[in-house]
Amino acid sequence: MMSKLGVLLTICMLLFPLTALPLDGDQPADRPAERMQDDFISEQHPLFNPIKRCCDWPCTIGCVPCCK
């Protein structure tokens, strides 16, 4: 019974390696310096509304967050 579990575990590890799982290291929350830089760039954007703290429509030209 234990050898069958070992074989099954080995097959599963070969088919689904742990490196294939997405890691959360590439999330924006893990890169605060880049987030701050992105916010700074948005605040200088001509469509940025400083009162609402978002970009007026249309905001398809690199200005986030979008006012809706």
Swiss-Prot record:
- Cellular compartments annotated: Secreted
MF (Gene Ontology): ion channel inhibitor activity; toxin activity
Q: Which domain of life is it from?
A: Eukaryota
Q: Which residues form the propeptide?
A: 21-51
What's a single GO CC term here?
extracellular region
Q: List the keywords (alphabetical).
A: Cleavage on pair of basic residues, Disulfide bond, Hydroxylation, Neurotoxin, Secreted, Signal, Toxin
Name used for this protein in its record: Conotoxin ArMMSK-01
Q: Per the UniProt entry, what species is this protein from, by scientific name?
A: Conus arenatus (Sand-dusted cone)
Q: Upper taxonomic classification of the species? A: Eukaryota, Metazoa, Spiralia, Lophotrochozoa, Mollusca
